């Protein structure tokens, strides 16, 4: 036997939510009263209001800096449109469970992106509750619970000093602006020969010893700290301290620099040799050949004493060097005995006179042609 079908009005009532139309709904307010939120209507709800109200709010990240102040920030650019989100906070199950509004907002491009809490508002060992809310959509909110002792970031260590304990041992000391027993430290050091750092963990003591050092090397040290493990379980380290150096400034050269210098010297030497060879061949082509004593006699014999033939001097230059006069030989003899005549005869030439000195040659000009 067939069951009677549902009335048409019942089917329509069941399909109304699927068609996106509203019904008369009520919700309970915190004081227990009923609050009517919508009346029965047969129109479609705006899709943009649905999408905005269902979008998740950005996550809030809080960090306590050296227990002096705390910043809670969020990514304001993740919103579909610029929105000044508001932040409320309180401490769970404590005397400070009263809801507080943020009194000091941080801004990014004139949009709220964080909140800063001062030292008096920070209670490390109480559960911190933070609530982010969209003021345009009060029901759009997100709540997080945080343990602040795990979110502490100390300041970087300060006043690094080095002491030489012995001929080959160094001790590094530093200071922190927080209780030393709450911090652990990480020391890094390297020499000017090293390409990477060597790390060494140090407990709450603020000193580190290096048992063996090389006086010919230059050492660099730096330190950072973390709020762990006695007072909290923070995972974030502080910034690195300013580095401190020890050792000779004239240490051995870096192997890489030594290899680079060797290559530069080799290439420079080869370039110099090639340049000298080029200059030598150029001079050999442009300068006249100068014979050695061994083959000078052979050259004179081969070229019949013609210097210009084998020296490379041009014919025009050789002709211009020819003299334009002729020489007459002058005979010089020894001084005659006393009483002898100075001349051999009445027509004797001065060139034939006897003189204790060398007589210059006599010249006669060639007749002009």
UniProtKB/Swiss-Prot annotation:
Gene Ontology biological-process annotations: CD4-positive, CD25-positive, alpha-beta regulatory T cell differentiation; cellular homeostasis; cytokine-mediated signaling pathway; gene expression; immune response; interleukin-15-mediated signaling pathway; interleukin-2-mediated signaling pathway; interleukin-4-mediated signaling pathway
GO cellular component terms listed in the entry, alphabetical order: cell surface; cytosol; endosome; external side of plasma membrane; membrane; nucleoplasm; plasma membrane; receptor complex
Pfam families in UniProt: CRLF2-like_D2 (PF21605), TSLPR_D1 (PF22012)
Keyword Cytoplasm in record: no
Residue ranges, Cytoplasmic side: 284-369
Higher taxonomy: Eukaryota, Metazoa, Chordata, Craniata, Vertebrata
Superkingdom, taxonomy of origin: Eukaryota
Keywords linked to the UniProt accession: Cell membrane, Disease variant, Disulfide bond, Glycoprotein, Host-virus interaction, Membrane, Phosphoprotein, Receptor, SCID, Signal, Transmembrane, Transmembrane helix
Membrane topology, as annotated: Single-pass type I membrane protein
Disulfide cysteine pairs (residue numbers): 62-72, 102-115, 182-231
Compartment annotation: Cell membrane; Cell surface
Organism expressing this protein natively: Homo sapiens
Family under the similarity heading: Belongs to the type I cytokine receptor family. Type 5 subfamily.
Subunit structure: The gamma subunit is common to the IL2, IL4, IL7, IL15, IL21 and probably also the IL13 receptors. Interacts with SHB upon interleukin stimulation. Interacts with IL9. (Microbial infection) Interacts with HTLV-1 accessory protein p12I.
Protein name, as recorded: Cytokine receptor common subunit gamma
GO molecular function annotations of the record: coreceptor activity; cytokine binding; cytokine receptor activity; interleukin-15 receptor activity; interleukin-2 binding
Annotated ranges, domain Fibronectin type-III: 156-253
Transmembrane regions: 263-283
Entry-linked PANTHER family: CYTOKINE RECEPTOR, INTERLEUKIN 2 RECEPTOR SUBUNIT GAMMA
Protein role: Common subunit for the receptors for a variety of interleukins. Probably in association with IL15RA, involved in the stimulation of neutrophil phagocytosis by IL15.
Extracellular compartment segments: 23-262
Signal peptide as annotated in the record: 1-22
Motif (WSXWS motif): 237-241
